[in-house]
């Protein structure tokens, strides 16, 4: 459950290390984002000499949350951290690698490029 002012780790090699959510997309009164939702965030920490700099506004898709998501078969998936992958306007990731596991629900949300780059899909 990601809301405004939430910090997320960046799970790709786009250059950002941490982003802070400033808006959850998908409606004017939408408060929370879950796995597969698109957010707008600001880069709070970045790697030197990379394309994304501190204080840049970016779009990102949430790939891991500490809040568990419940599946149809009753299973709950929960991760150790909140993480996102930086995307462009078309929904393609800015980085070329994705670190750590991602949830299978991303495939249902048409983020197949992120799923194919991930080392593990849970």
Swiss-Prot record:
Gene3D superfamilies: Ribosomal protein L14 (2.40.150.20). GO terms for biological process: translation. Keywords: Chloroplast, Plastid, Ribonucleoprotein, Ribosomal protein, RNA-binding, rRNA-binding. It comes from the Eukaryota. The keyword Nucleotide-binding does not apply. GO terms for cellular component: chloroplast; cytosolic large ribosomal subunit. It is found in: Plastid, Chloroplast. InterPro entries: Ribosomal_uL14 (IPR000218), Ribosomal_uL14_bac-type (IPR005745), Ribosomal_uL14_CS (IPR019972), Ribosomal_uL14_sf (IPR036853). GO terms for molecular function: large ribosomal subunit rRNA binding; structural constituent of ribosome. SMART domains: Ribosomal_L14. Pfam families: Ribosomal_L14. Belongs to the universal ribosomal protein uL14 family. Binds to 23S rRNA. Part of the 50S ribosomal subunit. PANTHER family: 50S/60S RIBOSOMAL PROTEIN L14/L23, LARGE RIBOSOMAL SUBUNIT PROTEIN UL14M. NCBIfam families: rplN_bact. This is Large ribosomal subunit protein uL14c. It comes from Mesostigma viride (Green alga).
